[in-house]
Amino acid sequence: MPFTLGQRWISDTESELGLGTVVAMDARTVTLLFPATGENRLYARSDSPVTRVMFNPGDTITSHEGWQLQIDEVKEENGLLAYTGTRLDTEETAVTLREVLLDSKLVFSKPQDRLFAGQIDRMDRFALRYRARKFQSEQYRMPWSGLRGQRTSLIPHQLNIAHDVGRRHAPRVLLADEVGLGKTIEAGMILHQQLLSGAAERVLIIVPETLQHQWLVEMLRRFNLRFALFDDERYTEAQHDAYNPFETEQLVICSLDFARRNKQRLEHLCDAQWDLLVVDEAHHLVWSEDAPSREYMAIEQLAERVPGVLLLTATPEQLGMESHFARLRLLDPSRFHDFEQFVEEQKNYRPVADAVAMLLAGNKLSNEELNMLGDLIGEQDIEPLLQTANSDRDGAQNARQELVSMLMDRHGTSRVLFRNTRNGVKGFPKRELHTIKLPLPTQYQTAIKVSGIMGARKSAEDRARDMLYPEQIYQEFEGDSGTWWNFDPRVEWLMGHLTSHRSQKVLVICAKAATALQLEQVLREREGIRAAVFHEGMSIIERDRAAAWFSEEDSGAQVLLCSEIGSEGRNFQFASNLVMFDLPFNPDLLEQRIGRLDRIGQAHDIQIHVPYLEKTAQSVLVRWYHEGLDAFEHTCPTGRAIYDTVYHDLIAYLATPENTDGFDALIKTCREQHEALKAQLEQGRDRLLEIHSNGGEKAQALAESIEEQDDDTSLIAFAMNLFDIVGINQDDRGENLIVLTPSDHMLVPDFPGLPEDGCTITFERDVALSREDAQFVTWEHPLIRNGLDLILSGDTGSSTISLLKNKALPVGTLLVELVYVVEAQAPKHLQLNRFLPPTPVRMLLDKNGNNLAAQVEFETFNRQLSAVNRHTGSKLVNAVQQDVHAILQLGEAQAEKSARALIDAARSEADEKLSAELSRLEALRAVNPNIRDDELAAIDSNRQQVMESLDQANWRLDALRLIVVTHQ
């Protein structure tokens, strides 16, 4: 190679050294100094792995003093280059910069610069970059983006609500599905969509204290959302890091009590600029016009400051119209300001519900009914649609559906309230109760008697709680020497049941963690029964492992022993046998226990086994739950209300179970109240609201579309390719499970989303639902999203050289494959990617500028190519550099044409969709006051900003591959 002192070269193998300068040479070697790092390198003069750095007219270069020069002319004298052009900071022309004075920290970012500087990537990285661009663009445009990545079953009514609400600007809604229908999942789906699209960045979740960990686990396990749990200790710690402790985290969970208890803390919460507020168990927010509770006022303060609000409640409005109004008032105080007016409005919705029922029944409508429909819809030119709906012609069904949609858009609280009931949703199993009456051991009788004498001063409630758990009373007296499990008949029954049903998975729930741990030891030591334990003293990872062991079909645990608190938020639908070793204190906890198995999607009827000891509080409670509330075999929305009504009487019977006088009458009273309340609920069901919340065929089609996407294998192929190139080890464990671990030769030392000790992943939704230790990998999973960012935000794969062995073409024929990206810059909340995500435009040009890309598909072409090592590649580039420059100029003109077409199409689509949505809501605003002014203003503002951003869209060369034809 012809070296001269002062020339600038770059290392092919250590490009991070920057620009090198020739400082010494002899007949056989050359020494380069790399000023950016202060290092020297000694190379052989012949065949050294370095590339001469030469710039061309039109390029912009930087001097060692920091100013930039746009090159007009390049001169060579005695082997050294001098660049003449315009200095950009002073606009001085005819400025000369000698190559020895170039900035040594020079970074080549353009693909063509990297190619000419010898920074040549491996061929497989170029292919990965193009695939990443293509797949990313496709995923951004998916209409159900944000709904596929969660570890949940594809349940239509949940998807319908999430799809509707998740795309709104700052949604303010009340989610009031019945228990077991998945409100937490719906809220999580909405959050996931809003965070993924950039519509929201800061989220606050406020829940009762007992549900904090359940939400923390649910958000992480199902949605890969890492929330920070704030309590007194965390709040104090965070005060050292920021004036407002809540600004130290983007996603926060705290309890309602924590938020309400301290005035300064509430002020900090209100000032923390959240985008979304989620409040669970919102029916506990007590309100009356004269005396709202402190809890209600705290949430009211937050709701006034936070743009988006999701309230979750399982209590239907019929059990308290005033509290229902209070919750709606939090969402839109200007709309729901007068309780009396609200009650009157609700009465007026009955004709609308009747009209919907008529349309859905498919019966012919009378003229009177047609007139009523016309009046309710209030649209001009509605007559033809009404006539079609009332005929036998094609399209009658579609016309009826359109009329139903119009009615639902215009009336009721359907935009702010969503409520699904078990009656309206299919897919729930039956519940069958098996009670097992067992004798009370003499040891317990003695312990209870002594406890009664010693605890005479205890409150009735404390005595009642003690009487529910006789093993605890006995153990307190006996201490460490007590072995209640040796004589408690429930233990014998449980062992017998498990040994005679070895093939069945059984979930056992008891009130205390200590009971679960003792039972595990007994089952293991006496019968060799494989039992996993699950309690609040375990970490989330330990609970995951226990749940995973229980879920394994062949070698897994037969039984999972859970404490009351430990089982919160976990669902085990693959099991259908539930044993309640004891009974919980109130109906809500009973429903929560059964709800671990009784979920939508459960494939089998649920067998509920309740072994109880006669003459104890257990025998009282089992009768009250079953005969008084029918709470074992059916969900019991009335349970809490009746429990509160008869609380003192019930406590008295539980505290003194031997006293049964009047208990039958109490059960009869409770049953009558239960039936009356149930009838009241059924009569007051808002069919219109249920139809809207359920989503019908539209929701079913959405679920099927996502299921189809789940079956697409392109993600698996891409992910494996990505993991290989990034340097992540993959170990196939069978059963559709893969273990990923970091390797010593990764592209980055710490791959975001991959733990140091690795993780187990699956691409199968069913496997992910049964194996909580496995992460469910989709296009929306952090591993894939971070992988795409890693490849596309840097220059990985942006320049490469390949050989094409093809005897039909002359040796040395040049082809250049160009990948341009058309993109627009805009704030994330505008969700510009719906219309114009970063979109790749691929071209395959010959020397004359003919584009062969349409005839030569990428993957087919890629398989025909072979790699070139970097050193040989640099030589090839130097030989054909002028030709490549010429082809690049031809490509630029073609890229502009393609880019303009994409941008114009995106503008048309954005204008059409956003204008249509704005027009629809403006028209509805006249007849439905539930459409907020700020929502209309936001859509209008968004439309203008989106159009402005698309006007400024641009394109750039993202990757380049030089292909040389060979016959060898």
UniProtKB/Swiss-Prot annotation:
It holds the Pfam family Helicase_C. It comes from the Bacteria. It is an enzyme of class 3 (hydrolase). Keywords: Activator, ATP-binding, DNA-binding, Helicase, Hydrolase, Nucleotide-binding, Transcription, Transcription regulation. GO terms for molecular function: ATP binding; DNA binding; helicase activity; hydrolase activity, acting on acid anhydrides. A motif (DEAH box) lies at residues 280-283. InterPro entries: Helicase_ATP-bd (IPR014001), Helicase_C-like (IPR001650), Helicase_RapA (IPR023949), P-loop_NTPase (IPR027417), RapA_C (IPR022737), SNF2-like_sf (IPR038718), SNF2/RAD54-like_C (IPR049730), SNF2_N (IPR000330). Residues 164-334 form the Helicase ATP-binding domain. NCBIfam families: PRK04914.1 (NF003426). Interacts with the RNAP. Has a higher affinity for the core RNAP than for the holoenzyme. Its ATPase activity is stimulated by binding to RNAP. PANTHER family: DNA ANNEALING HELICASE AND ENDONUCLEASE ZRANB3 FAMILY MEMBER (PTHR45766), SWI_SNF-RELATED MATRIX-ASSOCIATED ACTIN-DEPENDENT REGULATOR OF CHROMATIN SUBFAMILY A-LIKE PROTEIN 1 (PTHR45766:SF6). This is RNA polymerase-associated protein RapA. The gene is rapA.
